[in-house]
Amino acid sequence: MIKVSHETPLCLLGDSENFNDYDYCLPHLLDEEEGYLEYFRQAKAKGRYIIMDNSLHELGEAYDSARLMHWINELVPNEFVVPDVWENRDASVVNARKWAQIILPKGVTKVAVVQAQTIHEAATCYQTYRDLGYEKIAFSYG
């Protein structure tokens, strides 16, 4: 079954449960917008499925690792997208290797995102993630 979620402006977050199958959390906004943080605290309390990204697209680089860990430990999302580097296989693999060793709260699934500039890089990035033990692997839109 296909599930849909839209990144939702703060003013519509309260209504988003009516049109989103799950919640997609951008961690940098948890530090910037009190209303955003409160929405995700309530979503967690209601048992909503939460995927926490690393804010690469929004910031141009993944959010600070210490702040990511803080929010992972506080919200305990269902999934966490480990820090990746836009279209850079090698740097993304380095990050994935590091995060593969980090213990997250029970119930949080780590998701690694394939980043590459060629189909060969994409294939080797994917295989490396598999070899590192990632069970959920996503593909970048780039």
Place the predicted regions along the sequence by residue.
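Non-catalytic, usually N-terminal nucleic-acid engagement modules in DNA/RNA processing proteins
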Residues: 1-102
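Eukaryote-skewed repeat-based solenoidal scaffolds used as protein-protein interaction platforms
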Residues: 72-142
